[in-house]
Amino acid sequence: MSNMDIDGINTGTIDKTPEEITSGTSGATRPIIKPATLAPPSNKRTRNPSPERATTSSEAIVGRRTQKKQTPTEIKKSVYNMVVKLGEFYNQMMVKAGLNDDMERNLIQNAHAVERILLAATDDKKTEYQKKKNARDVKEGKEEIDHNKTGGTFYKMVRDDKTIYFSPIRITFLKEEVKTMYKTTMGSDGFSGLNHIMIGHSQMNDVCFQRSKALKRVGLDPSLISTFAGSTLPRRSGATGVAIKGGGTLVAEAIRFIGRAMADRGLLRDIRAKTAYEKILLNLKNKCSAPQQKALVDQVIGSRNPGIADIEDLTLLARSMVVVRPSVASKVVLPISINAKIPQLGFNVEEYSMVGYEAMALYNMATPVSILRMGDDAKDKSQLFFMSCFGAAYEDQRVLSALTGTEFKPRSALKCKGFHVPAKEQVEGMGAALMSIKLQFWAPMTRSGGNEVGGDGGSGQISCSPVFAVERPIALSKQAVRRMLSMNIEGRDADVKGNLLKMMNDSMAKKTNGNAFIGKKMFQISDKNKINPVDIPIKQTIPNFFFGRDTAEDYDDLDY
């Protein structure tokens, strides 16, 4: 290979100044952003703000009121337009990177590199912070870093006789150039596309890594992992991100805030901090599906000086969410390398649903390839990829096995690591494999917890968070939950706690042979119009829980 430096890594750069790209637009006046005012508690879903924080001016509010509400068909058409445009952007970035072979473009790691570069280039607040921090570091004699550039590790294909393998190359781009290219392609700021990518990364992290350290840091038991969806989502993902987050994730955010407030009693006197804290609690209340859970959140909202008692209340709330699940949205998020293939795949639709048939059909048509790290098994890696795309980290393994015709294994039994390849593992001549697990059946995705009834479960992870709306028993380790119920309920809100514990006990006392999602069936992948429903076969020999006894890397230990 040509252009190799000492370490065997190509280092390409794209040299163009921000001034040349923006051609004088950088001096445009920016709108004045007024501080947000705290809205009263509401169960109504808020409009998704942009990742760069939406304005709250009266003009913007009036504009929103006059907007005509989109019909489901219009929404599906705009979603289709978004995924196609994301694919076009990916193709442009790969041309810039000089990676034009189909195998290079099908590589999941190359798609993730482009996605991360895009997120870095569009995060103006982080860039501004990095520049200020670097300016301080330079004064202290540290190295100067150009934060106008961002880059990633791509993989270039190398053919050796009959063998195909991949070698890592590091490529940098100007942030302004990436932003301009993205906005031009999307025809707008493309905030929905950015949110879509962030959710995809979050779902991948949920599957590939455990979050035991993050749970323990806020005093939550690692067995509550099924409530911790979306724990790596950045705040700029807005209301779309909140919909994806599990109840435990929001509880952990609130507990961290209370911890800071206890250390600094002046924190909640700052109107911005107070607004942020109350917004977390309002989002948490909207997540709750039982009145007893909402009453407990109201108790915390009404606390003037949040402290230990509020942390105990929130801990109980997180435990109750194992039994009475909150509403967590699910969606199919595919790497943008798959979106880029839509024209070639003959995917002839003008509407696209991320929770219905179109996304699942596109997943089945795609031919994604992943780098194999040392010791990776290709079939096991395919299971990780499937679960990442469908956000199914906490779904019942028996349901996933029935939909794919493949016996799914718990995380501890998989011989594979995550999709991100750490720098120390990036070597010449890395192997790759096709992600082969496909859907034989499909079912619509759900945002409901499926709370009709409890089921039997195991150890480690003690509950499931349903993703597919199909009739089945909900897996739940009743023994583990009962251990959680033995706690002190005395204090200022004994009645509220008592009501919540009674609700949990009542739910636990239900028969274990009942089903959730009554009447919901699955369908052959060729049955787009749901003509011939099929009962889902639940194979008892497959473990319910993916994180039953976990041996995955912890997300906090990642070496990026």
Swiss-Prot record:
This entry carries the following GO cellular component terms, namely: helical viral capsid; host cell; host cell nucleus; ribonucleoprotein complex; viral nucleocapsid
Query: What lineage is on file?
Result: Viruses, Riboviria, Orthornavirae, Negarnaviricota, Polyploviricotina
Single GO molecular-function term?
structural molecule activity
Span of the signal peptide: none
Q: Which domain of life is it from?
A: Viruses
- Primary gene name: NP
Biased composition regions of type Polar residues, renumbered to the chain: 10-28
State the function annotated in the UniProt record: Encapsidates the negative strand viral RNA, protecting it from nucleases. The encapsidated genomic RNA is termed the ribonucleoprotein (RNP) and serves as template for transcription and replication. The RNP needs to be localized in the host nucleus to start an infectious cycle, but is too large to diffuse through the nuclear pore complex. NP comprises at least 2 nuclear localization signals that are responsible for the active RNP import into the nucleus through cellular importin alpha/beta pathway.
Q: What is this protein called?
A: Nucleoprotein
Write out the PTM section of this UniProt entry: Late in virus-infected cells, may be cleaved from a 56-kDa protein to a 53-kDa protein by a cellular caspase. This cleavage might be a marker for the onset of apoptosis in infected cells or have a specific function in virus host interaction.
InterPro entries referenced in this protein's UniProt entry, alphabetically:
Flu_NP
- Pfam families in UniProt: Flu_NP (PF00506)
- Description of how the protein assembles with itself and partners: Homomultimerizes to form the nucleocapsid. May bind host exportin-1/XPO1. Binds to viral genomic RNA. Protein-RNA contacts are mediated by a combination of electrostatic interactions between positively charged residues and the phosphate backbone and planar interactions between aromatic side chains and bases.
GO terms of biological process kind: symbiont entry into host cell; viral penetration into host nucleus
Q: Where in the cell is it found?
A: Virion; Host nucleus
Tell me the keywords, alphabetical order.
Capsid protein, Helical capsid protein, Host nucleus, Host-virus interaction, Ribonucleoprotein, RNA-binding, Viral nucleoprotein, Viral penetration into host nucleus, Virion, Virus entry into host cell
List, alphabetically, the SUPFAM superfamilies matched.
flu NP-like
Q: What family does this belong to? A: Belongs to the influenza viruses nucleoprotein family.
Give positions of region: Disordered: 1-73
